[in-house]
Each structure stands twice: as C-alpha cells, then as structure tokens.
Amino acid sequence: MVTNELSEKIKIYILRILNKQFMYPDEIIENCMEEFGAQINTPNPSLTIKNQLKILSDDKMVAYYHGYKITPKGRKEI
C-alpha cells in the first residue's frame, strides 16, 4: 500500500527530475523504481507510479508532448 506521504514524495521526485530534463514515461518509472522501489508495497509498483503521473498531468503540473515535461504550475510546487 502506498501512503499519502509516499505519494507526495513520489510526486515531488517526479517534478524534480522533470525540472532537469524532458523524459519519456518509461524513464520516469525506471527512475522512481530505483528511488522508491522497496518502499512501494503494491502488487504492481510501476502502475502506482503511472497513476501518480496521471494525477500530475490532470493537475496540469506536467504536460505530455511525446514525453513528459514540467509546466510552470509544476515548477511552483518544488
């Protein structure tokens, strides 16, 4: 199970790595798995990270243009 605290850490981590560079979804998932893999206690951790990306996208903090990049709204969060 992923707690709200861990979800927030994943969210901030995604925003920070996207602030550095444009990334494809698989790269984001791979980086998050390296960083948080042992802490995500779900049957499908990569789906958990994909869901977090979707939430960020729905909140207009990241945008998808053949890959993800951070938006000005997302930059304000970090």
Each model region followed by its residue ranges:
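General structural signal for alpha-helix termini and helix-helix connectors
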Residues: 16, 20, 34-38, 62
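Short acidic, hydrophobic short linear motifs in intrinsically disordered regions
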Residues: 23-43
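Short, hydrophobic-biased segments on the C-terminal half of alpha helices
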Residues: 46, 50-54
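Short alpha-helical segments that sit at the start of domains
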Residues: 1-26, 45
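Short, cationic-aromatic polyanion-contact patches
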Residues: 67-78
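A short, conserved structural fragment
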Residues: 53-67
